[in-house]
Amino acid sequence: MKIIVDMMGGDNAPLAVLEGAAAAVKEYGVSLIGVGNEELVRKTAAEHNIPLDGIELVNCTETIEMCDEPARAIRSKKDSSIVVGLNLLKEGRGDAFVSAGSTGALHVGASLIVRTLKGVKRPALATMVPAKKQAYLLLDCGANVECRPEMLAAFAVMGSCYVNRVEGRTSPSVALANNGAEESKGTPVLREAHQLLKTTPGIRFVGNIEPRDVPNGEVDVVVCDGFTGNVILKLTEGVAKMLLGMLKEMFLRNLGGKVAYLLLKSGVSDLKHQMDSEEYGGAPFLGAKQPVIKAHGSSKAKGIK
């Protein structure tokens, strides 16, 4: 397998990307194509003693910044790491493209360069989110801020297929994120989407799900627009960090708490491990003709690997 990697994407690029890429080559035996400013990449690798074995470098002179307007950037920055990387994927030079760069640019690029599967209007960004019973697939989690009912139905089909094939779950349950369980709740788009999902073949739609019930992990797939999904995802991350911090502070207040913390430390560590976004690597754009993976913008080496 050969994976194309955006060396310039993310808050910690190119160092974290280089470290993660080198670790992936060593541990998984994959071949990589690193796309980015070759001079900077080689300089960073030399300064930090990072081997470039198994990494073919493709030079680029431009970078799409987080503040750039996605569609304009994809069209104007032809020599950016994202555009070049996606074109390499389209040409068959690699099996997948991974980037921690701009979500919007990746979304537009996946649509315009890689293209979408027949019947899919826009790719959906999907990620597995840890929950009480079991992790669930959340889509869209940040690519399509506004969605029509038929788009949400397409997301449900793609999400159901993904969970079945990748997670091995038979007849996965699909729920629509809404502000109430009743069919009459929500915006006109959500009400129409609910009716459409009830008659969509190939999925097991179980109705609406309220935000308070999402973390229980009772359903396999949660469908929503990208704005709602991104709020759910980031709120989950924030609450997890807050609770872990509060637990630690509570345990360390007195001697009894410290003793209890020592006894429960392995369990707390396991929980922290489950809630760590670095453990989940990247999120695929479902519906693109070829695999395009979005890594967290703040990814460190572990997340990239």
Residue locations for each model-derived region?
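A short, small-residue-rich loop immediately preceding and capping a beta-strand
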Residues: V5, G94-A105, G109
